[in-house]
């Protein structure tokens, strides 16, 4: 299972990329697109990607909160919230994400969505599930704190919906996910998205593809120097 920071995973690829994110973070969705653009520019680069939890609002009630009330309180006013989200919409359009913030009615607690992402790693469909959750929340306006929505997302990603329903119901891995979130903060992660490449290099925020490409080049340069005969 992904969660050791060093991460103890069987990475046999040329590069591993660990992504710390939250499922209600629009910049994480944008950052995913920018990373994908960088990877598309390097088609020969084999990567293994693992997603890790960071709850932006860990104290959110289990049932979530009314979206308008929550964002108005968070940003000081409904007008300020709209202004900020309009700016994010523009950033999303640049990477072909049609954010539909007006459609979102609930701001969910994201713990259960992170539990599901954890299980998706073992199922071999983690990246696909993250994409599905982003789409369902930011574009379709679904409540990704709702177990029915999470089960549907899991099924769409190819997971066993019966098993997922059982795991969600019995509270499996709640503490493990919370512990990993805490570990990320202890390592210095204070905002998301946060990308760790080969356990050595960090890219913080939804940076442009050029930032990832520069990191790829630095890693290749460093590894070539390490492998060079003395």
Name these PLM-found stretches:
Residues 22:
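Acidic active-site catalytic centers that drive phospho-/nucleotidyl reactions
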């Amino acid at each position: 299972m992904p969660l050791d920071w060093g991460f103890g995973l069987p990475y046999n690829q040329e590069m591993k990329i660990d992504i710390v994110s939250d499922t209600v973070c629009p910049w994480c969705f944008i950052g995913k697109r920018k990373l994908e653009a960088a990877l598309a520019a390097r088609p020969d680069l084999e990567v293994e990607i693992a997603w890790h939890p960071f709850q932006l609002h860990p104290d959110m009630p289990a049932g979530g909160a009314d979206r308008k009330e929550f964002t108005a309180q968070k940003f000081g006013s409904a007008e300020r919230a709209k202004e900020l989200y309009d700016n994010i919409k523009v950033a999303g359009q640049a990477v072909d994400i049609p954010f539909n913030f007006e459609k979102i009615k609930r701001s969910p607690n994201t713990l259960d969505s992170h539990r599901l992402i954890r299980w998706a790693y073992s199922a071999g469909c983690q990246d696909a599930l993250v994409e599905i959750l982003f789409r369902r929340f930011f574009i379709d306006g679904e409540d990704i704190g709702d177990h029915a929505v999470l089960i549907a997302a899991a099924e769409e990603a190819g997971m066993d919906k019966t098993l997922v329903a059982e795991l969600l119901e019995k509270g499996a891995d709640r503490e493990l996910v919370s512990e990993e979130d805490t570990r990320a903060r202890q390592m210095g992660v204070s905002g998301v998205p946060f990308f760790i490449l080969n356990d050595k290099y960090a890219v913080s925020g939804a940076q442009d593809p050029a930032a990832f490409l520069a990191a790829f080049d630095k890693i290749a340069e460093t590894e070539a120097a390490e492998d060079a005969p003395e």
